[in-house]
Amino acid sequence: IRHESTVTGGVQDVYGEDSATEDQSITPWTLSVASGFSLLRNPHYNKGLAFSERERDTHYLRGLLPPVVISHDLQVKKMMNSIRKYDVPLQRYMAMMDLQEMNERLFYKLLIDNVEELLPIVYTPTVGEACQKYGWIFKRPQGLFFSLKEKGKIHEVLKNWPEKKIQVIVVTDGERILGLGDLGCQGMGIPVGKLSLYSALGGIRPSACLPVTIDVGQTMKFVDDEFYIGLRQRRATGQEYSELLDEFMYAVKQNYGEKVLIQFEDFANHNAFNLLAKYGTSHLVFNDDIQGTASVVLAGLMAALNLVGGSLSEHTFLFLGAGEAGTGIAELIALEMSKQTGIPLEETRKKIWMVDSKGLIVKSRMEMLQHFKRPWAHDHEPVQELVNAVKSIKPTVLIGSSGAGRTFTKEVVQAMATFNEKPIIFALSNPTSQSECTAEEAYSWSEGRAIFASGSPFAPVEYNGKVYASGQANNAYIFPGFGLGLIISGAIRVHDDMLLVASEALADEVSQENFEKGTHIPPFSNIRKISAHIAKVAAKAYELGLATRLPQPKDLVAYAESCMYSPAYRSYR
């Protein structure tokens, strides 16, 4: 049996995105054959000045384009020159979004070929500002909006989306956008950005991706903003909220089947954990803030141990922030320690401590703690300040996921450096303004000894004549390849063991050259190859009996690479 990429994981390749090659011809179908002006206005098919002489004759494009014919590569060069002329990141973001709406293949080729430069533009940190100003810059719908007005009609509204073969949905309710709080309906920039990365980095076909925003109101911060695009009412909670989410999840499964991946994105803590627990046994669901963040941080830690020495179980961890990201990371670390040592999970959790807004999480606070914090309450006297917790616990690893900027103060970092030769410090909060400390602060305050990673990128730092290239613990290392692995295997559920496999696969991609440059996370320049290796989570899906696409390919990495979407232009009949 030959495994080929003609259908990208078993879903019909509507636009010939995978089955055709540059030398093969396809028909640009919309409701009818697109030609002339309509072809230029269709982002799936538009090639701009790259239309050949024959295509211009065949599809009535003569006179609608200047006479020159240019290559795809020259278009990329031209667009990069244009984007680099903008000094303001939001202007670059808007230019990229305009390109995506005009020429989809050029957008993805541009992003793939220049991923390290453009990733901070199409996603964090720039996407945070884009969400804050989404009402001002909104031009054209890029996904589906479900508000309380659509309650009882979600199944019908889903049918309004033109693509019918959906593989991945990223959905948010806008309540906790990055570290920026409740942005309501304007959180749509997050699903749009995430799915752009699913396609560019993980090779999922753009036509198989659906961004969704659930609008149940907001905190009324936009009540006086005349350009706000969402409901102008207080956020719905309780039964009203649950019923809308139930209807949405049921409708998605009815429309697209059991194998569609639903990624929950930027839900508030109280909903994020509940939704994952509620639907995890009945749907293929994934929470990037809880599971994706955990997987990439665990990979970074596993790689960092090559520089520090020792196993995970020999280290002590202190977290600032006990929300969905912090507790998700902690649980995956505890699971990996349990897997490595055979020690029960309840015991490995005791190596991990947490500080929230009220101080160190200890057993004397148990009755007042939210359910997801209780596993991390250990025997210790109460401690209010982070620096005192550091001095008392003496962690070897300090991880920030608090969303509170500049909380890793000079005193905190210096305390870490007093009892650690190489303190591991991960300041993970996004965007950059909310990072617990900067790369420069971590290196200078630790006298160049820290092993540092952040959620958003920082420029290389020079300290005492040495250049330090800090790692970026960006979820984009994990979720695109993770999603690809689920799709190519036809997985019907996500299992924690898959997250451990993804972490191990990413850690294995860190080279000796990376270590010599002071980073324990591989560069984004190789991200599509990294994603193909992370897609080995498919093997775990087969092992656990959760895969439905049979038989299992012999070489999953090669199969994953063959299934990846290519932005190369196609020739039209």
Curated annotation (Swiss-Prot):
It comes from the Eukaryota. Its cofactor is Mg(2+); Mn(2+). Transmembrane segments: none annotated. The keyword Plastid applies. CDD domains: NAD_bind_1_malic_enz. Its EC number is 1.1.1.40. A divalent metal cation binds at residues 265-266, 289. Belongs to the malic enzymes family. This is NADP-dependent malic enzyme, chloroplastic. The lineage of its organism: Eukaryota, Viridiplantae, Streptophyta, Embryophyta, Tracheophyta.
